[in-house]
Protein backbone atom coordinates (compact mmCIF):
# COMPACT_ATOMS: atom_id res chain seq x y z
CA UNK A 1 0.00 0.00 0.00
CA UNK A 2 2.12 2.87 -1.28
CA UNK A 3 0.14 5.95 -0.27
CA UNK A 4 2.94 8.47 -0.04
CA UNK A 5 2.92 9.32 -3.75
CA UNK A 6 -0.87 9.44 -4.16
CA UNK A 7 -3.37 12.18 -3.37
CA UNK A 8 -6.36 9.94 -4.12
CA UNK A 9 -6.17 7.49 -1.22
CA UNK A 10 -9.62 6.37 -0.04
CA UNK A 11 -10.44 6.44 3.66
CA UNK A 12 -11.16 2.70 3.52
CA UNK A 13 -7.66 2.02 2.17
CA UNK A 14 -6.12 4.01 5.00
CA UNK A 15 -8.22 2.26 7.65
CA UNK A 16 -7.14 -1.11 6.26
CA UNK A 17 -3.50 -0.03 6.27
CA UNK A 18 -3.59 1.07 9.92
CA UNK A 19 -5.54 -2.05 10.83
CA UNK A 20 -2.71 -4.15 9.42
CA UNK A 21 0.05 -1.89 10.79
CA UNK A 22 -1.21 -1.10 14.28
CA UNK A 23 -4.45 -2.82 15.21
CA UNK A 24 -3.63 -6.44 14.55
CA UNK A 25 -0.63 -6.26 16.88
CA UNK A 26 -2.84 -5.32 19.81
CA UNK A 27 -5.60 -7.68 18.64
CA UNK A 28 -3.22 -10.65 18.39
CA UNK A 29 -1.74 -9.96 21.82
CA UNK A 30 -5.21 -9.96 23.34
CA UNK A 31 -6.25 -13.11 21.51
CA UNK A 32 -3.07 -14.96 22.47
CA UNK A 33 -3.61 -13.95 26.09
CA UNK A 34 -7.21 -15.14 25.90
CA UNK A 35 -6.24 -18.50 24.38
CA UNK A 36 -3.44 -19.03 26.90
CA UNK A 37 -5.84 -18.07 29.68
CA UNK A 38 -8.33 -20.73 28.60
CA UNK A 39 -10.97 -18.46 27.06
CA UNK A 40 -13.53 -19.87 24.67
CA UNK A 41 -12.97 -19.36 20.94
CA UNK A 42 -15.83 -16.85 20.89
CA UNK A 43 -14.37 -14.83 23.76
CA UNK A 44 -10.91 -14.94 22.16
CA UNK A 45 -12.42 -13.66 18.90
CA UNK A 46 -14.29 -10.89 20.71
CA UNK A 47 -11.10 -9.83 22.47
CA UNK A 48 -9.34 -9.82 19.10
CA UNK A 49 -12.06 -7.56 17.65
CA UNK A 50 -11.89 -5.35 20.75
CA UNK A 51 -8.15 -4.93 20.20
CA UNK A 52 -8.59 -4.31 16.51
CA UNK A 53 -11.13 -1.52 17.08
CA UNK A 54 -9.22 0.12 19.92
CA UNK A 55 -6.06 -0.04 17.78
CA UNK A 56 -7.84 1.82 14.98
CA UNK A 57 -9.08 4.45 17.43
CA UNK A 58 -5.57 4.76 18.88
CA UNK A 59 -3.94 5.36 15.49
CA UNK A 60 -6.57 7.92 14.49
CA UNK A 61 -6.05 9.63 17.85
CA UNK A 62 -2.33 9.75 17.05
CA UNK A 63 -3.09 11.39 13.69
CA UNK A 64 -5.36 13.90 15.42
CA UNK A 65 -2.88 14.74 18.19
CA UNK A 66 -0.13 15.36 15.65
CA UNK A 67 -2.22 18.30 14.41
CA UNK A 68 -4.19 19.40 17.47
CA UNK A 69 -2.13 18.17 20.42
CA UNK A 70 -0.20 20.27 22.91
CA UNK A 71 3.54 20.11 22.18
CA UNK A 72 4.39 20.05 25.90
CA UNK A 73 2.08 17.10 26.52
CA UNK A 74 2.41 15.33 23.15
CA UNK A 75 6.17 15.10 23.57
CA UNK A 76 7.07 16.00 20.01
CA UNK A 77 6.58 18.88 17.64
CA UNK A 78 3.04 19.31 16.40
CA UNK A 79 2.64 19.07 12.64
CA UNK A 80 5.32 16.50 11.90
CA UNK A 81 2.91 14.52 9.74
CA UNK A 82 1.96 17.71 7.89
CA UNK A 83 5.54 18.75 7.15
CA UNK A 84 6.47 15.25 5.99
CA UNK A 85 3.29 14.94 3.87
CA UNK A 86 2.41 11.72 5.68
CA UNK A 87 -0.86 10.31 4.43
CA UNK A 88 -2.90 10.38 7.59
CA UNK A 89 -6.63 10.15 8.18
CA UNK A 90 -6.58 13.93 8.33
CA UNK A 91 -4.83 14.58 5.00
CA UNK A 92 -6.65 11.82 3.13
CA UNK A 93 -10.03 13.15 4.17
CA UNK A 94 -8.99 16.72 3.48
CA UNK A 95 -8.20 15.75 -0.12
CA UNK A 96 -11.40 13.73 -0.42
CA UNK A 97 -13.67 16.46 1.01
CA UNK A 98 -12.01 19.69 -0.12
CA UNK A 99 -13.56 21.96 -2.69
CA UNK A 100 -11.48 22.75 -5.78
CA UNK A 101 -9.82 25.80 -4.23
CA UNK A 102 -8.96 24.00 -0.99
CA UNK A 103 -7.67 20.97 -2.90
CA UNK A 104 -5.43 23.18 -5.03
CA UNK A 105 -3.97 24.76 -1.89
CA UNK A 106 -3.41 21.33 -0.33
CA UNK A 107 -1.64 20.16 -3.48
CA UNK A 108 0.58 23.27 -3.43
CA UNK A 109 1.62 22.56 0.16
CA UNK A 110 2.14 18.84 -0.42
CA UNK A 111 4.22 19.43 -3.54
CA UNK A 112 6.27 22.29 -2.05
CA UNK A 113 9.91 21.30 -1.61
CA UNK A 114 10.90 24.50 0.18
CA UNK A 115 8.64 26.00 2.83
CA UNK A 116 8.54 27.59 6.23
CA UNK A 117 7.56 24.79 8.63
CA UNK A 118 5.30 26.94 10.83
CA UNK A 119 3.60 28.47 7.80
CA UNK A 120 2.86 25.06 6.26
CA UNK A 121 1.52 23.62 9.52
CA UNK A 122 -0.68 26.69 10.07
CA UNK A 123 -1.99 26.67 6.49
CA UNK A 124 -2.80 22.96 6.39
CA UNK A 125 -4.36 23.08 9.87
CA UNK A 126 -6.52 26.01 8.73
CA UNK A 127 -7.65 23.95 5.74
CA UNK A 128 -8.44 20.98 8.00
CA UNK A 129 -10.57 23.28 10.15
CA UNK A 130 -12.36 24.80 7.14
CA UNK A 131 -13.13 21.36 5.74
CA UNK A 132 -14.22 20.00 9.14
CA UNK A 133 -11.53 17.35 9.41
CA UNK A 134 -11.06 17.93 13.14
CA UNK A 135 -14.71 17.02 13.87
CA UNK A 136 -14.66 14.18 11.36
CA UNK A 137 -11.60 12.64 13.01
CA UNK A 138 -13.10 12.95 16.49
CA UNK A 139 -16.29 11.26 15.29
CA UNK A 140 -14.33 8.39 13.72
CA UNK A 141 -12.22 7.95 16.86
CA UNK A 142 -15.39 7.76 18.95
CA UNK A 143 -16.93 5.32 16.45
CA UNK A 144 -14.05 2.85 16.76
CA UNK A 145 -13.95 3.31 20.53
CA UNK A 146 -17.69 2.55 20.74
CA UNK A 147 -17.20 -0.51 18.53
CA UNK A 148 -14.42 -1.73 20.80
CA UNK A 149 -16.71 -1.46 23.83
CA UNK A 150 -19.35 -3.56 22.04
CA UNK A 151 -16.87 -6.39 21.50
CA UNK A 152 -15.59 -6.21 25.06
CA UNK A 153 -19.18 -6.36 26.33
CA UNK A 154 -19.64 -9.66 24.43
CA UNK A 155 -16.82 -11.37 26.35
CA UNK A 156 -18.54 -13.82 28.67
CA UNK A 157 -16.78 -13.09 31.94
CA UNK A 158 -17.87 -11.03 34.92
CA UNK A 159 -17.77 -7.27 34.35
CA UNK A 160 -15.16 -6.78 37.06
CA UNK A 161 -12.80 -9.06 35.09
CA UNK A 162 -13.21 -6.78 32.04
CA UNK A 163 -12.93 -3.55 34.02
CA UNK A 164 -9.16 -3.23 33.68
CA UNK A 165 -9.29 -3.60 29.89
CA UNK A 166 -12.17 -1.13 29.70
CA UNK A 167 -10.25 1.36 31.86
CA UNK A 168 -7.12 0.90 29.74
CA UNK A 169 -9.10 1.60 26.56
CA UNK A 170 -10.66 4.65 28.18
CA UNK A 171 -7.21 5.99 29.14
CA UNK A 172 -5.98 5.42 25.59
CA UNK A 173 -8.83 7.48 24.19
CA UNK A 174 -8.39 10.33 26.65
CA UNK A 175 -4.64 10.57 26.16
CA UNK A 176 -3.13 13.83 25.04
CA UNK A 177 0.28 12.35 24.16
Where are these regions (language model features)?
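All-alpha prenyltransferase/terpene-synthase fold signal
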Residues: 1-177
Amino acid sequence: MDFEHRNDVAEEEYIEMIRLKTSVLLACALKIGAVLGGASAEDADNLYRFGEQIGLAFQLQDDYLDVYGDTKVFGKAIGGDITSNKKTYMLINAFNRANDEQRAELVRWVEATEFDRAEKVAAVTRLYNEIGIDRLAQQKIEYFFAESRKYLAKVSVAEERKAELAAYAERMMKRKY
